């Protein structure tokens, strides 16, 4: 048994065969992902011109599986916890006059508010810069025909895609998969994927696991 992974940009008919089987196997309505548009415009977002990738796998000469990669415009916040501002504790000057004390308190409050506003502005700027600088891709349509499962074809497809994403200078790779697909999830995690929050609207989000992989 020889497994061969090849570029599929000129093999759209074969990709469509696999995509159809993939949807039938999932048994889920993918209209919320605009699947029909994706299907009819192949290779579309998976094309090299769009910073994508599209592969099919053969077992000997038999069509066995597929996978795609496409660029996605989302933001991944590397710092989950918001940083707190460390304010210097100034020694309290004892002032006998109540008016002076009130003025000092008001000034301190104003300074704290200004510091908080500055910090918020800095955080917003950092997030905007991070979003502009981040290059993120999404793994889609990983599928292996039932008669070829157990031959590590899925793992080979994932490995190929990750290597390509690194060569394309992507910062992160993300994906979503059904929680019931435990074998697929174990493969993803073996490559270093970790779970994180949903990155797009999915009506089946309670049944879906969202994963990300830092590539740099």
Swiss-Prot record:
InterPro entries: Acetyltransferase_Enz, Acyl_CoA_acyltransferase, GNAT_dom. Its EC number is 2.3.1.-. SUPFAM superfamilies: Acyl-CoA N-acyltransferases (Nat), beta-sandwich domain of Sec23/24. Residues 1-216 form the N-acetyltransferase domain. It holds the Pfam family Acetyltransf_1. PROSITE patterns: GNAT. GO terms for molecular function: acyltransferase activity, transferring groups other than amino-acyl groups. Keywords: Acyltransferase, Transferase. CDD domains: NAT_SF. Belongs to the acetyltransferase family. This is Uncharacterized N-acetyltransferase DDB_G0290199. It comes from Dictyostelium discoideum.
């Amino acid at each position: 048994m020889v497994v061969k992974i090849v570029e599929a940009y000129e093999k759209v008919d074969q990709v469509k065969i696999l995509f159809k089987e993939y949807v039938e196997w999932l048994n889920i309505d993918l209209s919320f992902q605009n699947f029909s548009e994706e299907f009819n415009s192949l290779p579309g977002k998976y094309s090299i011109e769009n910073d994508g990738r599209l592969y099919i796998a053969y077992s000997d000469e038999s069509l066995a599986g597929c996978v795609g990669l496409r660029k996605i415009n989302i933001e991944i916040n590397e710092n989950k916890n918001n940083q707190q501002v460390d304010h210097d504790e100034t020694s309290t000057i004892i002032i006998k006059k109540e008016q002076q004390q009130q003025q000092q308190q008001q000034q301190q409050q104003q300074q704290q508010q200004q510091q908080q506003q500055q910090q918020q502005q800095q955080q917003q700027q950092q997030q905007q810069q991070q979003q502009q600088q981040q290059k993120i891709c999404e793994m889609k349509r990983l599928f292996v025909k039932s008669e070829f499962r157990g031959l590590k074809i899925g793992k080979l497809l994932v490995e190929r895609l990750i290597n390509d994403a690194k060569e394309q200078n992507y910062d992160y790779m993300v994906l979503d998969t059904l929680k019931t697909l435990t074998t697929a999830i174990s493969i993803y995690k073996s490559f270093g994927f970790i779970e994180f929050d949903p990155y797009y609207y999915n009506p089946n989000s309670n049944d879906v696991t969202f994963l990300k992989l830092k590539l740099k």
